A protein has these predicted regions:
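Glycoside hydrolase catalytic-domain context in secreted enzymes
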Residues: 1-317
Length: 317
């Protein structure tokens, strides 16, 4: 449940390779899968076959979360594309975000997806940053209002949105993506975390994506303070945290707070990252537990959070 199947492992261009799926997944239940290379027409059939395999061929028969990227429309040929968030933010009309999410939900359902990696409510404070278009703007309150509307639009239509990118992100040093955001506690809470707090406290959001950069050179995806003390204990978030792609592996390959996969997995999971996306450090956890080097309770907590959301969204029905 705490691992993610990358589409590159099981697809041959536009075709799902059932042998690859069998070899990769085995009889193990997985948390999530995406189909980024697929056209919209091919998505529904492929997602159905993957779900059928997970329910009928794995030991526990737990449904998998089918995941799509959709900052301004599903990232699949044939889907409708809408203006980027920075354009919507410029209208100062948050209701547009709700309408956008409602219409995107129709596309997602038709393609077999239940989880969407959106909305992005990063507060942008450096125009040199290459991801400015993903956000609604520079004002925390405005970003929060748009986030509330977009999340509500998805939830009303049976799609689980994912709030991203949690942790200071939109003002990296020199405007460089992945660079650390430098600020004190006041700016952290009043600027960068404010829209996330607004959405968590005013919607039924069940998924949050942690960033792969750092705050004051401490990786956000290894920060117990951000992911547990603030998000869960202070704000009352009850869902799961999904790593930005490669964030766990970056702890060893980029930020160098971990020397290997085992240390990266321990740092991320104990901080509060429930699901590792696009890397395989969490594979080391089974051996760590068998050797008595890691407490299984952290895996139980993460699995429980993910299963709870799957039940709430009706995946078992």
């Amino acid at each position: 449940q705490i691992r993610h199947i990358h589409s590159s492992k099981i697809f041959n261009r536009q075709e799902l390779d059932m042998q690859k799926l069998t070899d990769w997944a085995g009889n193990t239940s997985w948390g999530f899968v995406e189909g980024f290379p697929l056209t919209g027409d091919n998505c529904a059939k492929s997602m159905y076959l993957i779900q059928k395999y997970m329910v009928e061929k794995t030991r526990l028969g737990i449904p998998i979360f089918t995941v799509a990227e959709s900052l301004h429309g599903a990232v699949h040929d044939g889907a409708t594309i809408y203006p980027q968030n920075i354009a919507l933010g410029s209208t100062f009309n948050p209701e547009l975000a709700r309408k956008k999410a409602q219409m995107i939900s129709d596309d997602l359902h038709s393609m077999g997806f239940r989880q969407v990696l959106s909305p992005c409510i990063d507060v942008v404070r450096d125009l040199r940053w290459g991801r400015v278009e993903e956000s609604y703007g520079e004002d925390p309150y405005l970003c929060g209002l748009f986030g509330i509307e977009e999340v509500s639009g998805y939830l009303e239509n049976g799609i689980s949105p994912m709030l991203k990118h949690y942790g200071p992100h939109g003002n990296p040093l020199s405007g460089l993506n992945l660079a650390s955001v430098e600020c004190g506690l006041r700016d952290l809470h009043e600027i960068y975390l404010k829209p996330f707090e607004m959405v968590v406290k005013n919607t039924g959001i069940l998924a949050v994506m942690s960033t792969y950069n750092s705050w004051n050179h401490i990786p956000n995806s290894a920060s117990h303070y951000l992911l547990t003390d603030i998000l869960r204990d202070e704000w009352g978030f009850k869902g799961y945290v999904y790593s930005d792609w490669g964030a766990v592996a970056m702890l060893k390959d980029f930020q160098h707070t971990a020397k290997d996969d085992s240390e990266a997995a321990i740092q991320a999971l104990t901080a509060g990252v429930d699901l590792e996306a696009s890397s395989n450090c969490y594979w080391a956890l089974e051996q760590l537990i068998e050797q008595g080097r890691f407490d299984e309770k952290y895996v139980d907590l993460a699995v429980g959070r993910i299963l709870r959301v799957k039940f709430e969204l009706g995946l078992f029905e």
